[in-house]
Amino acid sequence: MNLTHLDEQNKPKMVDVSDKDNTTRIATASGIIEVGQAAFDAVIANTAKKGPVLQTAVIAAIQGTKQTSTLIPMCHPLMLTSVKTDIEELPELPGFKLTVTAKLTGQTGVEMEALTGVSVGLLTIYDMLKAIDKGMVIRNVQLEHKSGGNSGDFNRA
């Protein structure tokens, strides 16, 4: 297997994308946080002591998406053109599903940015609710869709 992040001497390197075409690239990722009923109720009633949980998670998800290259060593700094978020209430768990879609026109994909945005957003929910519930579970952080670039499209079935 040829790993693109290793050079001929097996040393880590950032992939050279300078010869790639600029194309529109979109990636959507999602993840779930399961919380206890008291934590869920605090979010819905907007009574969590640290403030508005879901609004803060959205801002954190956008920031996480933008900061991916500072967190993941081999990710290129990207000029994102759009970051969209959605948080779905899951009262049956109880919990929340966070979805992040990142978009750009450039030479490399935005999958890691969407995944990082989801991760940071869910971690923010955890941070803001940990005084109420330490047993929260973050799960199923995954790529849902990707389009653009040489590797083709991906859609989770």
From Swiss-Prot:
Substrate binds at M74, C75, H76, M112, E113. InterPro entries: MoaC (IPR023045), MoaC_bact/euk (IPR047594), MoaC_sf (IPR036522), Mopterin_CF_biosynth-C_dom (IPR002820). It catalyses: (8S)-3',8-cyclo-7,8-dihydroguanosine 5'-triphosphate = cyclic pyranopterin phosphate + diphosphate. Pathway: Cofactor biosynthesis; molybdopterin biosynthesis. GO terms for molecular function: cyclic pyranopterin monophosphate synthase activity. The keyword Lyase applies. The active site is at D127. Keywords: Lyase, Molybdenum cofactor biosynthesis. The keyword Lyase applies. Its EC number is 4.6.1.17. Pfam families: MoaC. GO terms for biological process: Mo-molybdopterin cofactor biosynthetic process. Belongs to the MoaC family. Homohexamer; trimer of dimers. NCBIfam families: moaC, PRK09364.1. Catalyzes the conversion of (8S)-3',8-cyclo-7,8-dihydroguanosine 5'-triphosphate to cyclic pyranopterin monophosphate (cPMP). This is Cyclic pyranopterin monophosphate synthase.
